[in-house]
Amino acid sequence: MCSSKMPCSPSASSLCAASPPNCCHPSCCQTTCCRTTSCSHSCSVSSCCRPQCCHSVCCQPTCCRPSCCQTTCCRTTCCHPSCCVSSCCRPQCCHSVCFQPTCCHPSCCISSSCCPSCCESSCCCPCCCLRPVCGRVSCHVTCYHPTCVISTCPHPLCCASPPLPLPFPSPPVPLPFFLSLALPSPPRPSPPLLSPVLIPSPSPSPSLPSLSPPLPSPPLPSPHFPSVNPKSMLQ
């Protein structure tokens, strides 16, 4: 417990010697008063947490300065936005449990413990993708690097295997009607040319000997003349 016997800064000795709730005043943080577990809610103001306080319970989510990030202050329960760069924890925090999707700096990805929780759409560096979680049969959409192609996979460093083909070929996207009018119409396919069918002419077959005897030709009719009796001509 903080007491009046504990050393405080000369300018705030009267304030620091008051009750324990006032013991963690910003002017007292240079003393051992802020190294104990007696820091109360008065230490949770944004201007209170000093580097010396980061190992104590004084480091609450609303009381974590960037200077605290080199210590255990940068935990899930004490990761203040001021402790982060672009809503991600500083590299010094990458060894702690500060690996969360909302608090993971790209430089944290060099750690093997970062990838399972750091591979989110907003925070996944190529170093994560070398892990088996991204190098197997499929790559999850939320585990791609921003420079990766989302549809197929991968940044050259994301997957050791070649990019996977799409399961089905994507159908062609139809053009709008006004654009289709501006395009030249494709030439119509001409019907296939029919090759002329050559009908073979009957070749003269050699005369074969007939097995049946030739039929006799019918007798020619004789010219019809009136019959003349020679005797009647003599009379």
From Swiss-Prot:
Keyword check for Nuclease: no
Region feature (16 X 5 AA repeats of C-C-[GIKRQVHEML]-[SPTRV]-[STVQRCP]): 1-132
GO cellular component: a single term: keratin filament
Region Disordered, annotated ranges: 203-235
Superkingdom classification of source: Eukaryota
Family that this chain belongs to: Belongs to the KRTAP type 4 family.
Subunit structure: Interacts with hair keratins.
Its job: In the hair cortex, hair keratin intermediate filaments are embedded in an interfilamentous matrix, consisting of hair keratin-associated proteins (KRTAP), which are essential for the formation of a rigid and resistant hair shaft through their extensive disulfide bond cross-linking with abundant cysteine residues of hair keratins. The matrix proteins include the high-sulfur and high-glycine-tyrosine keratins.
Protein's recorded name: Keratin-associated protein 4-16
